[in-house]
C-alpha cells in the first residue's frame, strides 16, 4: 500500500467513525437528513428522492438523489462522508438494471416510476405455511 492509499484510508476511517451508512444503490428511494445552517441557527432538513447514481470511491464517493418538487425535477449531489449529512435512511429498494439512471430525467409521471424489488421469503416460512 503506497503513501496516498494509507492517508486516504486514515481519513476514511476518521470520517466514517461515528456514522452508519446503509447499503444502497441506484433505484433505491432514500431519505437524506441534511444539516442546514441559517444564520446562527442550524436545523435538519429531510431530502427524499430516488438515488440515480453513485460515483467515485473511498473518501471521494458521492451519490445523486432526484426528486420531483412542485412539478419540477430537482437533483442534488451529496458527498457520502460529508459532515453536513446527519443520516441516510433507505425507504424502499428499486429493481433496476443500470448503474446510472439518467434516463429518468426525460420521463414524466407513471413512466418515471421504478418497480420495487421483492425480497424472497426464507424457505422455513414458506414450508411452514404449506403444512
From Swiss-Prot:
GO terms for cellular component: cytosolic large ribosomal subunit. GO terms for molecular function: structural constituent of ribosome. Keywords: Ribonucleoprotein, Ribosomal protein. It comes from the Bacteria. One of its GO terms (biological process) is translation. Belongs to the bacterial ribosomal protein bL19 family. HAMAP family: Ribosomal_bL19. NCBIfam families: rplS_bact. This is Large ribosomal subunit protein bL19.
Amino acid at each position: 500500500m503506497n503513501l496516498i492509499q494509507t492517508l486516504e484510508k486514515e481519513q476514511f476511517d476518521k470520517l466514517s467513525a461515528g456514522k452508519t451508512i446503509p447499503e444502497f444503490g441506484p433505484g433505491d428511494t432514500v431519505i437524506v437528513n441534511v444539516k442546514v445552517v441559517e444564520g446562527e441557527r442550524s436545523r435538519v432538513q429531510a431530502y427524499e428522492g430516488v438515488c440515480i447514481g453513485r460515483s467515485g470511491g473511498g473518501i471521494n464517493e458521492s451519490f445523486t438523489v432526484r426528486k420531483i418538487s412542485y412539478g419540477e425535477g430537482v437533483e442534488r449531489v451529496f458527498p457520502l462522508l460529508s459532515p453536513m449529512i446527519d443520516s441516510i435512511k433507505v425507504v424502499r429498494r428499486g429493481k433496476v438494471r443500470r448503474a446510472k439512471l439518467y434516463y429518468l430525467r426525460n420521463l414524466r409521471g407513471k413512466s418515471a416510476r421504478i418497480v420495487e424489488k421483492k425480497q424472497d421469503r426464507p424457505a422455513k416460512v414458506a414450508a411452514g405455511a404449506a403444512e
